[in-house]
Amino acid sequence: MVKSYTRYEPTEFFGVIASSGCNILGQPSSSAKSVGRAIVGGLESVLEWDLKTGQLLSKWKDSDCSAKVTCIANFDEMYAVGYADGSIRLWKDGELLITLNGHKSAVTTMDFDKMGTRLASGSMDTDIIVWDIVAETGLFRLRGHKDQITKLLFITPPSKNTAEETVVDTDIDSGDMDVDSKSSDSFLLSVGKDSFMKLWDLSIQHCVETHVDHQGEIWAMCVSPDAKRCLTAGTGSDVKVWEISFPDDNNFTPTTKAFQQLGTFTRQSRDRPITLAYDVSNRYVVFQAHDRLLEVFRLRSSAELEKILNRRRRRKKSEDVSITLKDEYEPFALIRTTARASSVAWIPGNRTPTLVTSLQNNSIEVYALDVKSEGSAAPLTERASRISAIEIPGHRADVRTLALSANHDVILSGANGSLKLWNKKTTSCIRTIECGYVLAASFINNDKCIVSAYKSGELEVYDIASSSLIERIQAHDGAIWDLAVGHDGTYFATASADHTVKLWSLKSSFDFVPGTTRKVTTLKLEQTRQIDFTDDVLAVKISPDGRFVAASLLDNTVKVYYLDSLKFFLNLYGHKLPVLSMDISYDSKLLVTCSADKNVKIWGLDFGDCHKSIFAHQDSIMEVTFQPDTYNFFTCSKDREVRYWDGKSFDLILKLRGHHSEVWALAVGPTFVVSGSHDHSIRLWEQGDDLVFLEEERERELEEQYESTLVSSYENAEADGEVKDGDVAAVTKQTIESLKDGEKILEAITIGIEDLDQEIQYRLDLLKSPGKARGPRNPILAHLGVSAEEYVLNTFKKIRSSHLDDALLVLPFEHVLSLFRFIDIWASRKWSIPLVSRIIFFLLRTYHRQLTTTVKMRPLLNNIRSSLRGSLQEERSLIGYNAAGLSYLRHEWELTHNTSLEDIDSTSLEVDGKKRAFSNIV
């Protein structure tokens, strides 16, 4: 009989407040009492935090994506999220709208245009892609940078800021419609690590300006809200200031530049910048570098600059004076965060300018500027104050140890600086204890206390109910690497770098309350015995039956002793590097060890024989733990995986993937597994309803490997066939979803062509022999009761718009020719003209040379052209009619709702003695 296992599935991860590799967004809150909201990346999820209460409002995660979030941009409440695999997902109200694939590596920067209909994205693959959000497809790919894109922004010429957003001239009778494309963001500004600053004209899809004024990488850029100034910062402390001045069409010459460098001013920090950002009022600009310093500059008003100019004229008694950039940008505040900053953003909507910053130690801080200190002599470091922070829901450092309570409802985690207790059901932090560098911790005394071991050699015992320290002792002269609790929870063993294993027990004692005669019961740690070794002890374990104690040494061996007499029993050797962790089975018959040599060895405790040696991981194995009451065990490694093994057959059952960094710790319950990682996350894996069969699991892994190889082969083939010359290219990227969609189209065309040919042959046979019955149709078409052309069109309609172009690239050319037969039918019957037009235009662009040399396609293409021209004219007329109607409704609404200030009659105010009320003032 084939043995089956229960599948472990990822259910939740917690402990992450903000990932260091993603920017942060500040958003206003609906509550007047709240400071605002923060939108940050949390590994593969997007987290929304309330900055006042520290509550996690929502978590957005696509179950099909395991890549890390690298970039976030927003248009109002619609968020574009870029991932490390190059994909982009659009979210609104916590729901996934669309997925866009085009980049071949991590997305580094994104920006929406002012209408929110286009999105520009830059990546580590040096490409810029402009996306059409409405059509859910990529418009074009811009090439020109030679290294990673660090920042890009849509630019609207300042002269057009006050113009109407959209100008529509409509001729209802003819259906002509002209939309002024220049009214929208028609320029794109980009900077990269190649030291280039490029200005792209999106109307012609070409780079019109390139500036190479920086000596090295350009790490940050921002544009003022009025689009008149641009700031760029590179590797040094200098900030370059650019004036944005787009020439009119009449004054345009080939040598005219829209960006003119005005000069530089200096930041205080010497580290490379990460973020530059203007606030919405255009009064302040913040500079964030790769350190703990945030610098805020204030932009002086024209009146202040005029005072400075007059003062200089009086001092020099000359008119030959001018304003410098140092005069315009005044250092206003210096903010020193508690750790290195990852990103910073302004929070709009607050009365005082407020900054939110994510830190590299997995926390978020909020600072408010003291605007009353403008013009005062207050120190720069005292002009901003921290008003809130989010620190409790996560550790400041990587998770080094995990433990479970006896009832498996509470999870204990330890890191450098803190111990935390988590509710397993709600994944909320219920206790936080400040401490030192924790290397091991566990529950003792019937889950009433916690014992923790530190790198300094200290042992501490805490009372859980009060979170108070009961006792602290210097237990060892070196770091305590491991801690093992006995079967009844009243004693434990510690393994240290001072070459000893010490056994400890909890003793109750009575102490007098100072100043009184009352006695209180306290717990004390008492060392009972000690085992001396010649090398550092890295791990220790006590058998469940209380008979043995095992210790792993730096000399790659494991020594087993009788616990009662501490007499030597077994010496286990075979590992090539030190054993980092070990565990003993529930019946005390098996010992499993894991080592830095990437191997797991299973030993018998009867005679000390090695049952099996398994090459288990691709990197050092950090911990191994048996599943309760079974011989199955789990391992975790620096290769970011948790693996599930059968200790009897020595087979690999499951690979649990999800962590983005080294996995340091494991805790195994009866039906779940908890893992802690260097990425600050604690992940929970629980048993599901699915069963795992080893053969099926291996086949599934091989299929995943084949699919990934297939996708990479398509990408390599496309890369070999791409023309690298030129600034513009098509937006294509094959994914496994697009390949599957292409196979669906291929299958539908094959079935449809057979049915069409059968129909033609049947009509020819009717001419020869009237009354002849038609042969059986394809079972799929017969079951659905549709014609071949309807079936193929329905297949296209089911494909995502973002996958359509990539799916069409999968088709062989002979199937493309067959597809044109269906396009001819669809165009003549006026079915789904927008979809049909998109398909035919893409095929004509892709296979233009082949189609023009195929003689038999000429009549078919002529038929399609004549049919499609009339249909497109009707669609154009319909759009023009609707646009005219919307323009009329907008005009009527403005007449009834908008009132200008010139309508106010001052004489009527004097007579009536009261102000006139207005519904809205624009």
Curated annotation (Swiss-Prot):
Pfam families: Beta-prop_WDR3_1st, Beta-prop_WDR3_2nd, Utp12. The modification Phosphoserine is found at S769. The keyword Phosphoprotein applies. Disulfide bonds: none annotated. One of its GO terms (biological process) is maturation of SSU-rRNA. One of its GO terms (molecular function) is snoRNA binding. PROSITE patterns: WD_REPEATS_1, WD_REPEATS_2, WD_REPEATS_REGION. Keywords: Phosphoprotein, Repeat, WD repeat. WD repeats lie at residues 63-101, 102-141, 169-210, 213-252, 268-307, 336-377, 394-432, 434-472, 475-514, 532-571, 574-615, 616-655, 658-695. The keyword Repeat applies. GO terms for cellular component: cytosol; nucleus; Pwp2p-containing subcomplex of 90S preribosome; small-subunit processome. Belongs to the WD repeat WDR3/UTP12 family. This is Uncharacterized WD repeat-containing protein C3D6.12. It comes from Schizosaccharomyces pombe (strain 972 / ATCC 24843).
